Amino acid sequence: MTKYALVGDVGGTNARLALCDIASGEISQAKTYSGLDYPSLEAVVRVYLDEHSVNVEDGCIAIACPITGDWVAMTNHTWAFSIAEMKKNLGFSHLEIINDFTAVSMAIPMLKKEHLIQFGGGEPVDGKPIAVYGAGTGLGVAHLVHVDKRWISLPGEGGHVDFAPNSEEEAMILEILRAEIGHVSAERVLSGPGLVNLYRAIVKSDNRLPENLRPKDITERALADSCIDCRRALSLFCVIMGRFGGDLALTMGTFGGVYIAGGIVPRFLEFFKASGFRGGFEDKGRFKDYVHGIPVYLIVHDNPGLLGSGAHLRQTLGHIL
């Protein structure tokens, strides 16, 4: 008889839950719930389990916030809870709450070739470190290493490192944003809101007044080639995305590959392919040759967070991935 575990991927807006076959890692019965409709994460889990008439003893839920102890307070939501108390209330034997990019990194060993699009470089080197990052509401970063038949995710808040301009234009953008918001992290330019920041700074650098645009508006106008400022912002986004990925590659020697996740890049895939992304990735001066062969992949799996939550839990329970 198939034994299932509960897996989840929770962001500031929605909670996506599913079942994971503990033996195979296969994900099924995925369903998305609006976080605004429920008073707590526990309430959502109970509704899901009732709807699917399934008894589970184990669970792993990825959440878009730092996980530093038993108490979890979501960054972009009002939900807050004790992991131990939630585990007890649900009657689970195991309940893991992990960072969302920990989950994405743990999905990488489970991905197949059809789940990836490669952007330059050669073949990944087995046993070498891996980096994963992605732009969405924010900028998530994690690394992954393989030690003694176990995958170990190294989470962090790499999206909040300093934005490092590498041209006169970018230096001007930094100056404008710094005057507005103070500290300018990489996330302030590599995210949905970051794309808006780039657009606004580009327009203001020319002493003009920017329109009140959403990330979606900027992308659509850039792809339609109907707004030169929007197109420049999206082009710059791709280049900076490349340089940031190259920074991750240098920091950990990620000859196992660099992986891009998140919901933004797939929305303009053809534009991204033709952009200066790879040039930005390899623009490392004396260390260009060092990163030249490192492959970069875009993850196109529908639910890497759920897949990785399942992989993390299965490994915790003693399975070899």
From Swiss-Prot:
One GO CC term, this protein: cytosol
UniProt key word Heme: no
HAMAP family: Glucokinase
Reaction(s) catalysed by this chain's protein: D-glucose + ATP = D-glucose 6-phosphate + ADP + H(+)
Superkingdom, natural source: Bacteria
GO MF annotations, alphabetized: ATP binding; D-glucose binding; glucokinase activity
InterPro entries per record: ATPase_NBD, Bacterial_glucokinase, Glucokinase
Gene Ontology biological process terms from the UniProt entry: glycolytic process
Keywords attached to this entry: ATP-binding, Cytoplasm, Glycolysis, Kinase, Nucleotide-binding, Transferase
Enzyme class: transferase
Gene giving rise to this polypeptide: glk
Binding, ATP: 8-13
Listed EC numbers: 2.7.1.2
Family: Belongs to the bacterial glucokinase family.
Keyword Transferase attributed: yes
Protein name: Glucokinase
Gene3D superfamilies: 3.30.420.40, 3.40.367.20
Cellular localisation: Cytoplasm
A UniProt-annotated Pfam family: Glucokinase
Species of provenance: Salmonella schwarzengrund (strain CVM19633)
